[in-house]
Every structure is written in structure tokens, then in C-alpha cells.
Design a protein with these regions (language model features):
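Start-transfer (signal-anchor) and selected internal transmembrane alpha helices
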Residues: 1-44
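Membrane-interface transmembrane helices that cradle and orient dolichyl/undecaprenyl
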Residues: 23, 170-189
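Active-site lumenal/periplasmic loops and adjacent helix-entry segments of GT-C-fold
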Residues: 30-31, 44-148, 152-174, 202
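Transmembrane catalytic cores of multi-pass membrane glycosyltransferases
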Residues: 46, 50-58, 69-75, 81-87, ...
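Transmembrane alpha-helices and membrane-interface helical segments
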Residues: 122, 126, 177-184, 211-219, ...
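Short hydrophobic alpha-helices at membrane interfaces in multi-pass membrane enzymes
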Residues: 181-196, 222-230
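Signature aromatic-anchored transmembrane alpha helix within multi-pass, membrane-resident enzymes
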Residues: 351-380
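Extracytoplasmic
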Residues: 379-522
Length: 522
């Protein structure tokens, strides 16, 4: 290990302004005090950013987790979430932990969400310790990241950390650990974290590996072998997907994900692409006070990383015959750029602005946290801010879902409005995730599965089209639907249609049982 220069040690001992050093300081030990501080930050992050079981993207991930914990669930339609789950071990890790501990599955999912936030903050603290000399600056980076977990990442439809559990919840801290280990010259540990990332989220692991390559190229000139390897990987890309436009229902599903196509992004979303990269370039070209060389290396590596994938997104988003490649979502690379950016920015804000003033810390982080709290309130206006496991929901949709979970058979198959997730008051909660019952495909989240797995397209279209005109369905329409699909129950607007037995109603919804074939024959 190359020692820190004597002049830097002299500056430290005399209390003079810290200057950048050529090597990072020795690894900061993880003390009980640090762990407690990270636990407090984790708790505050949950309270600020909220938690929502099975909402949005978790509507795909949570059913797979629950299916691992209880294989008797979801006898119909599981392909719409298992297509994702079969590609990783994320559902197995979480689902098996519930099965082995025998704890309530909703509590286990919430616990993993909290653990994932703790791990992200711990990994960010490890990385900040390599970039900043002062402990206060290191914590500045971690606290800023914790305060901004809900920040949207440009036009990618991602946040730094979602207020619900997904595979990204674990892949993000794993990626940060991999980067920190790599920059600490612990290559074996970096590889182990990279492999773990691939196991829980293969897609995001590609970006993690690419960033490590950018770090290596930033630290030393590219070797010919590396160039040949990169060329070989790029040469294989044309064989991933067919080189022609998507067809039929698969194309409809693909174009339902407008964020795949960067030319449809708004101007402010493009600002979200280039502003962080420009600031990171400025970071890499300066010698900020109290930073190490790792700071500049990290900032410098993020620039070609972000620009490369932005260029890739622009290429695949232009010609129609390349539109299948938009499924690779190269702009998701910005997710990692944002995490690194806020860690570095937070450290510099502390170093230059906040310093040791408690009032300054509160003056910055209280308004930021309040802004994130209001953002989440606006995103989930009809739900509790933190949907604690076992609590009684305010949301009438979730109330109906939970009644269904507790009062209908596990093999029940439901039908409901294919656009139910967009209904006022629903707040994007997934039926399968909360009710734990099978259901016909929807037009909101299941279309996302189809956009990535076009082999599901025809089943998806047949199920969603069969429910066209749902708002006007009467008994005869439900009976006709039951002849096409094995549905036994429906969730519809109150009051339930005449002729159906509806054992549950709330102020908005009714849960109704369809008559069996024997009852219809009478």
C-alpha cells in the first residue's frame, strides 16, 4: 500500500485545510456506534419515504415471493410474474426466509425492505469513507442519500429506492458494496458482490459490471485484450433479439412502456440525464477539499458509463427495426449514477457548507425530507404513509383485497377491471400481491411483463380484451367470461350486479361469487 504523503499528515495534525491525497485512508472500522447511527437513519428513511406492500413494480415481485413461501397460491396466471422470478433467486431468498422462520409473510417482506435500506446506507458509508477524509463528510454523503431515496431517476420510471420491496432493493446495495470493494483493491469480495447482484437482479448486474470496467479503465490504460473482449460482447448483441419491429399484442405492450423510448422523454427528464453527469465531470476535474483520489476516479468513471448507455438508448430508440432492443432499458444505468452522485455531492456539501453547524444540517435536511414526504403523500394519497404489516388499511381497495385473502379459497380465480390499478383511490396496489389470489391479466403491470416477455402477449391480450367494457358488465357478461376462463369470483364497483351473491361490500367495492356450473344448470 502506498503511504499517505507526509504533507497531508502534517495538515491533519496542524488542523489546516485538508487537500486531496493520492490514496484513500485505511478502512474505517464498523463500530457499534456506526451501526446504531445507520439503524436510526434507516428508521427515519422508512418514516420519510413510506412503505406500501405490493405497490407498482412490487405487484410483480411480491406474488413470486408469496408463491415460494406457499406454492399452493396462484394456480392460474402465475406466468405473468414468474417469468421475472425464474431469472433470479430474489423471490427464493425472501420467500424461503418466510417459510423457514414461519413469520407472517407481510412482516418478512417489510423486514427485507428495511434491511435493504440499511444495507444501501452501509454500502454508501463504506464508499464515502474511501472518498472523504473527514468523518463528517462521509456522513454527509450518507445522510443526503437517505433523505433523497424517493428522487425519480430522470425518465426511467425508477427511484433511487422504492417505498416497496423489489429485486432492485437488494441489487442496489450489492452493487455499491462491489464498487467499494473494488476501489479498496479487494477484488475477490467485489466479484462476490457482483455475483450476488447477478443472482438477485441479472439486468442490473450488467450495469454493475460495466461500471467496474469503467473504473478499471479510469485507473489504467485499456489493454488490447479488454478492447477485444468488449468488441466480442458488443458483437453478440444483435443476436439477443430479432432485428425487426415487434408485432401485434407484443408491440402494444412494448409501446405501453413509454419510458423505454428516450425520444418520448420530456425536456426536464433530459436535464435529469445530463445535469448529474456535468456536475460529476466538474467533480472529476477539480481537487475538492478533504477528498481522496478515489473521489475523482469514481466521479470520472461515472461520466463515460452514463454517456455510453445514453448513446445506446438513443441508437435503439430510433429505427423501428431496433425497437425490440429498447427492452434492454440502457437508461437504467442512470440509477447507479444517481446513487454515486448524491453520495459525492452530500460529502462536498458537508465539507464546504454544513461543516459542524447543527442548524445548517437541520436547515438542509429537514426541508429535503419534508419534500420527499409530500412527494410520497401525493403518490399514494389514499393509503397510509407507512402500511405497517397487520395494520388495517384506509384504502378501500386494500380492504377488499385483505377480505378476499381471508375469506376466499386459495384456488379462487378473480376477474376485475383490467385498469383497476389506475382507479381513483387504488394507489397502484397489485391484487395478486395483497389478496394472494389468482386473477385475469391487467392492462397496467402485466403489460410490463409482456413487454419483456413477448411470448405472453396472446394470453395477455385475450384476457384483457375479454374484460373490455367492464364498467357495464351485468350478470350475463360475467357468466360468459366464466365460460372462457376459470373465474369463480369478481371484484367490482358497489353495488354488485343483480343475480350475484356479494358477501363483502365497502363504500366503493363489492366482492361477488359467481354461480357454479351446477347452479347455472338448475
Amino acid at each position: 500500500m502506498v503511504p499517505i504523503r507526509r504533507t497531508d499528515l502534517t495538515s491533519l495534525s496542524e488542523g489546516r485545510a485538508l487537500q486531496p491525497v493520492s490514496m484513500p485512508p485505511a478502512a474505517v472500522p464498523l463500530t457499534v456506534r456506526t451501526v446504531l447511527a445507520l439503524l436510526v437513519l434507516t428508521a427515519l428513511a422508512v418514516l420519510v419515504h413510506g412503505y406500501h406492500l405490493g405497490a407498482d413494480d412490487a405487484a410483480i415481485y411480491v406474488p413470486a415471493i408469496k408463491n415460494v413461501a406457499d406454492p399452493s397460491l396462484y394456480p392460474f396466471g402465475s406466468e405473468f410474474f414468474m417469468s421475472h422470478a425464474h431469472l433470479s433467486y430474489f423471490a427464493n431468498i425472501v420467500g424461503d426466509s418466510a417459510r423457514l422462520t414461519r413469520l407472517p409473510i407481510d412482516f418478512v417482506i417489510f423486514a427485507w425492505h428495511a434491511v435493504s435500506i440499511f444495507l444501501l446506507l452501509l454500502a454508501s458509508w463504506r464508499l464515502a469513507a474511501l472518498c472523504f477524509l473527514r468523518r463528517s463528510a462521509q456522513w454527509g454523503g450518507v445522510v443526503l442519500l437517505a433523505a433523497l431515496l424517493s428522487v425519480p431517476v430522470a425518465g426511467t420510471a425508477l427511484a433511487i429506492m422504492d417505498p416497496y420491496l423489489t429485486a432492485r432493493s437488494l441489487s442496489t446495495p450489492a452493487t455499491m458494496f462491489a464498487i467499494a470493494c473494488y476501489l479498496s483493491n479487494r477484488r475477490a469480495q467485489a466479484l462476490a458482490w457482483l455475483l450476488f447482484t447477478a443472482l438477485v437482479h441479472p439486468h442490473m448486474s450488467v450495469f454493475a459490471a460495466a461500471f467496474l470496467v469503467c473504473l478499471e479503465l479510469a485507473r489504467r490504460p485499456a489493454r488490447r485484450q479488454e478492447n477485444l473482449l468488449a468488441f466480442g460482447m458488443a458483437a453478440g448483441l444483435p443476436f439477443l433479439f430479432p432485428l425487426h419491429a415487434a408485432q401485434g399484442a407484443a408491440r402494444d405492450a412494448l409501446y405501453s412502456r413509454t419510458f423505454f423510448f428516450v425520444y418520448q422523454w420530456a425536456w426536464y427528464e433530459w436535464v435529469g440525464v445530463f445535469a448529474p453527469l456535468a456536475i460529476l465531470w466538474w467533480f472529476s476535474s477539480r481537487d475538492p477539499r478533504g477528498t481522496t483520489r478515489v473521489f475523482r476516479t469514481l466521479a470520472g468513471a461515472a461520466i463515460p458509463f452514463g454517456l455510453f448507455f445514453t448513446a445506446a438508448a438513443m441508437v435503439v430508440g430510433m429505427p423501428v427495426w431496433l425497437e425490440n432492443y429498447t427492452r434492454l432499458q440502457p437508461m437504467r444505468s442512470l440509477h447507479l449514477v444517481y446513487v454515486i452522485f448524491f453520495v459525492l455531492l452530500g460529502g462536498l456539501i458537508q465539507e464546504y457548507v454544513l461543516k459542524k453547524g447543527i442548524a445548517r444540517w437541520l436547515g438542509l435536511f429537514l426541508p429535503l425530507s419534508a419534500g420527499m414526504w409530500f412527494l410520497q403523500q401525493a403518490s399514494f394519497p389514499s393509503s397510509m404513509h407507512v402500511e405497517w404489516p397487520g395494520s388495517h388499511p384506509d384504502n378501500t381497495w386494500n380492504s377488499a383485497f385483505l377480505w378476499i385473502r381471508g375469506h376466499t379459497p386459495k384456488d379462487a380465480v378473480f376477474a376485475l377491471d383490467p385498469n383497476y390499478m389506475l382507479s381513483p383511490g387504488e394507489d397502484m396496489h397489485g391484487f395478486r400481491a395483497v389478496a394472494e389470489r389468482s386473477v385475469l391479466a391487467d392492462s397496467v403491470k402485466d403489460s410490463g411483463a409482456v413487454s419483456l416477455f413477448p411470448q405472453l402477449a396472446e394470453d395477455w391480450r385475450s384476457q384483457t380484451q375479454a374484460e373490455n367494457g367492464w364498467q357495464n358488465f351485468q350478470l350475463a357478461d360475467f357468466e360468459k367470461l366464466a365460460t372462457e376462463f376459470p373465474i369463480t369470483w369478481v371484484l367490482t364497483r358497489r353495488p354488485g350486479p343483480g343475480g350475484l351473491t356479494c358477501p363483502y361490500e365497502n363504500r366503493d367495492l363489492a366482492v361477488c361469487r359467481l354461480p357454479s356450473s351446477a347452479e347455472l344448470d338448475r
